[in-house]
From Swiss-Prot:
Lineage: superkingdom: Eukaryota
Family under the similarity heading: Belongs to the complex I subunit 5 family.
Upper lineage: Eukaryota, Viridiplantae, Streptophyta, Embryophyta, Tracheophyta
Species of provenance: Angiopteris evecta
Localisation: Plastid, Chloroplast thylakoid membrane
Protein name: NAD(P)H-quinone oxidoreductase subunit 5, chloroplastic
Pfam families: Proton_antipo_C, Proton_antipo_M, Proton_antipo_N
GO cellular component terms, A-Z: chloroplast thylakoid membrane
GO biological process: ATP synthesis coupled electron transport; electron transport coupled proton transport
E.C. code: 7.1.1.-
Main location: plastid
Function: NDH shuttles electrons from NAD(P)H:plastoquinone, via FMN and iron-sulfur (Fe-S) centers, to quinones in the photosynthetic chain and possibly in a chloroplast respiratory chain. The immediate electron acceptor for the enzyme in this species is believed to be plastoquinone. Couples the redox reaction to proton translocation, and thus conserves the redox energy in a proton gradient.
Key words of the record: Chloroplast, Membrane, NAD, NADP, Plastid, Plastoquinone, Quinone, Thylakoid, Translocase, Transmembrane, Transmembrane helix, Transport
Stored InterPro entries: NADH_UbQ_OxRdtase_chlpt_su5_C, NADHpl_OxRdtase_5_subgr, ND/Mrp_TM, NU5C-like, Proton_antipo_N
Residues spanning the membrane: 8-28, 39-59, 87-107, 120-140, 147-167, 185-205, 219-239, 258-278, 291-311, 395-415, 425-445, 574-594, 631-651, 710-730, 738-758
Length: 772
């Protein structure tokens, strides 16, 4: 055991070595490294597997009751400050190590197939290994300074991975948005760390928490200053875990590849903020005001994320807002003092959310050959439907993840979410109502996604006329294409450029050639016939003059004679889905808070015994009492599921091929349509931020530019111009001619006489009037 603890440094070093090896090889020997792309993936997976084995061993030692352990080295020391680096092993660390490594290795196995077509395959694995290493280093850090170092590395890796397809403007903008938004939180976190050290004189987490509590108890610190430092510390986790109002980066982060979306939302970046609050729990709990702020921020975030997810049509963005909502629960729990419930939900949510995201990636991977490689189509649920028939394993695992996230027993998230709901009612009726309503909304929007995606009829081979204005975008391959906005996505009049074998380019409807050439060849389509149809228009100056009949004949050949349907994903992707489905089913039982015949089943409470909270149970309740307390949370979730079933499920009489959301015209319909628009457009919060921050910054910049150009430069340039003309005037006055001097002297004397005469007349007139 001692040897295992002393070698804990191997856990973050293994993926770091993999990242550096692959990255340096790609930098110095790009061709050779790319030719060994599968070897690079195997190295990354193997080294992370070593880290996972050590993590599980440490977790087992913690379950057996072995004491916590710190491994420290002196980094910086003088008479005023002492700073150490090292590793901290405690129950929270061990659970997070297992979560990060297990989810990370399954994401890597999944990525081997998902990213196999991508030219950035090797670069992706280098980033992925560095991302995992950074999160593992953060989890093992014993002090806030070391946490901050790895915190920034996690942010940097998220920037690289969100913008992985940087040739797409949307991806480039998304990674910048995530980076800048998190800079706000990171700046607050840095100030909070410095302020905390100024108050306590220590960087060690346990020492500063104890000193801080002692100072609060003895009134040795100003409460306003203490709360200010605590809120600054909380600003970092609020941004990292996408808490309101710093949540706006999260849905745009879906521009990255789906495997990294799973890792960000399940076990790394979003989890980092919750982990930090849990790590600093004893520091925060000394300040009731700060705890109240944390709980309300979490509650508002949970409800806001759930309401925005209601009308999303992008599958990944719907899951992204679900991620925003669930960490809201996790932030609410420590805010009300329920440390155990927050840590428990962090674990159960990681596997469920990773399963859902990888399931969505499997769907997208199968939809791309049919509807095209644009995210606006391949991720749009309007094109899906009935996928369970063609992708039974993906559909089943996605359903398991959906049931878990909705809090349906006996799946993983039920046990943790129900505990948060019960504790919320105990702490505050308002927070209880918020958490309870959010649970109902979660059941609705999650099953809305499931029904629209996996039930009904497949809609990917259908197209409809669209008269709405189209919007341009750039696909991952860099081709400029067009897509219609929100509702009418099946377009016959959106065009893309196409090149025939002779090298000439034509604009053809995008939905005609949305299939990749390899899939068309597999269906034995006569591509040469299509080229011959277009060849008659080869000499036309206007490429838009291509006959509509040409498109109709090509479209009929593709759509009517060779209709394509999705296929189940590769075995490596299915292996990850099935592997994640296992903890989604069973991991919740480690925290079941009841005992039977003297046998305690709540391993999590025993594991977190040193960190008990005000809601810690004595494990004396039986199974019947526990399920009676869970009736309200399960009931509201089932209400949401039922409403979703009747609107979007197989019993729905609406034609989901035309519009997946119902439309009505009465007052109630107006209300729901307004709510739908509010949800679809993200509560207009992004628009508000654009007006306040982006447009406001532009207006301020233009105002400052105007002031600088016309006022500051005007004063400086005006003085220069006056000096110039004054000098010119004096230069002409010194011509060297005596008549000119005499003329000037006479004119000057005359002017002086005139001034004296006028002055004397004014004085005499004044004296005359004063006599009376």
């Amino acid at each position: 055991m001692e040897l295992l603890y002393k070698n804990i440094w191997i856990v973050p070093v293994c993926p770091f070595v993999a990242s550096m090896s692959v990255g340096l090889g790609l930098f110095f020997f790009p061709k050779a490294t790319k030719s060994l792309r599968r070897i690079c993936a195997i190295i990354s997976i193997f080294l992370l597997g070593i880290a996972m084995f050590i993590s599980f061993s440490i977790f087992w030692q913690q379950i057996r009751g072995n004491p916590n352990h710190q491994l420290l080295w002196s980094w910086f020391f003088n008479k005023d400050i002492s700073l150490q680096i090292g590793f901290l092993i405690d129950p929270l660390t061990s659970t997070m190590l297992v979560s990060v490594t297990s989810v990370g290795i399954l994401v890597m196995i999944y990525s081997d197939s998902y990213m196999s077509h991508d030219q950035g395959y090797v670069r992706f694995f280098a980033y992925l290994s560095l991302f995992t290493a950074s999160m593992l280093g953060l989890v093992l850090s014993p002090n806030p300074v070391q946490i901050y170092i790895f915190w920034e590395l996690v942010g940097m890796c998220s920037y690289l991975l969100i913008g992985f397809w940087f040739s797409r403007p949307s991806a480039a903008n998304a990674c910048q948005k995530a980076f800048i938004t998190n800079r706000v939180g990171d700046f607050g976190l840095l100030l909070g760390i410095l302020g905390t050290y100024w108050i306590t004189g220590s960087f060690d987490i346990h020492s500063l928490s104890e000193r801080f509590n002692d100072l609060i108890d003895s009134n040795g610190v100003n409460l306003f200053l203490a709360n200010m430092c605590a809120l600054l510390l909380f600003l970092g986790p609020a941004a990292k875990s996408a808490q309101f109002p710093l949540h706006v980066w999260l849905p745009d982060a879906m521009e990255g590849p789906t495997p990294i979306s799973a890792l960000i939302h399940a076990a790394t970046m979003v989890a980092a903020g919750i982990f930090f609050v849990a790590r600093m729990f004893h520091f925060f709990e000394a300040l009731p005001f700060t705890m109240n702020i944390i709980s309300w921020v979490g509650g508002i975030t949970a409800l806001l994320g759930a309401t925005i997810a209601l009308a999303q049509k992008d599958l990944k963005k719907g899951l992204a807002y679900s991620t925003m909502s669930q960490p809201g629960y996790m932030m609410l729990a420590p805010g009300i003092g329920s440390y155990r419930a927050a840590s428990f939900h962090l674990i159960t949510h990681a596997y469920s959310k990773a399963l859902l995201f990888l399931g969505s990636g499997s769907v997208i991977h199968s939809m791309e050959p049919i509807v095209g490689y644009s995210p606006e189509k391949s991720q749009n649920m309007s094109f899906m439907g009935g996928l369970r028939k063609y992708m039974p394993i993906t559909g089943t695992t996605f359903l398991l993840g959906t049931l878990s996230l909705c809090g349906i027993p006996p799946f993983a998230c039920f046990w943790s979410k129900d505990e948060i709901l019960v504790d919320s009612w105990i702490a505050s009726a308002s927070l209880g109502w918020i958490a309870w309503c959010t649970a109902g909304l979660t059941g609705f929007y999650m099953f809305r996604m499931y029904f629209v995606t996996f039930e009904g009829d497949f809609r990917g081979n259908l197209s409809y006329k669209d008269t709405d204005k189209s919007v341009s975008y750039k696909s991952i391959w860099g081709n400029l294409q067009t897509l219609s906005e929100r509702d009418k996505v099946f377009s016959n009049n959106s065009y893309t450029s196409f090149s025939d074998p002779t090298g000439d380019f034509y604009e053809i409807p995008e939905n005609v050639f949305s299939l990749p050439e390899r899939r068309i060849k597999n269906k034995s389509l006569n591509i040469e016939k299509s080229f011959n149809v277009l060849s008659d228009f080869k000499g036309s100056d206007n490429r838009n003059e291509i006959s509509e009949d040409a498109f109709v004949s090509i479209n009929r050949e593709i759509r009517n004679e060779n209709i394509l349907y999705p296929n189940e994903s590769d075995n490596s992707m299915l292996f990850s889905l099935i592997s994640l489905a296992i903890p989604t089913l069973f991991i919740g039982f480690i925290g079941v808070p009841f005992s039977h015949k003297g046998i305690n089943s709540d391993l999590l409470s025993d594991l977190l015994a040193p960190l008990t909270d005000s809601f810690h149970k004595d494990n004396s309740e039986n199974l019947v009492d526990f399920f009676l307390k869970s009736i309200p949370s399960v009931s509201i979730a089932l209400v949401g599921v039922s409403i979703s079933f009747f609107i979007y499920g197989p019993v729905s009489s609406r034609d989901l091929r035309k519009e997946i959301d119902p439309k009505t015209k009465d007052f109630l319909g107006y209300f729901f349509n307004s709510l739908s628009n509010w949800s679809y457009y993200r509560g207009y919060i992004d628009n508000l931020y654009n007006v306040i921050f982006i447009e406001g910054t532009r207006i301020l910049s233009k105002s400052i530019c105007f002031f600088d150009q016309w006022i500051i430069d005007g004063i400086v340039n005006g003085i220069g111009i006056l000096s110039f003309f004054g000098g010119e005037g004096m230069r002409y006055g010194e011509g060297g001619r005596i008549p000119s001097y005499l003329f000037g002297l006479i004119i000057g004397n005359i002017l002086m006489l005139i001034i004296l005469i006028i002055k004397n007349d004014i004085i005499q007139s004044y004296e005359y009037f004063t006599m009376f």
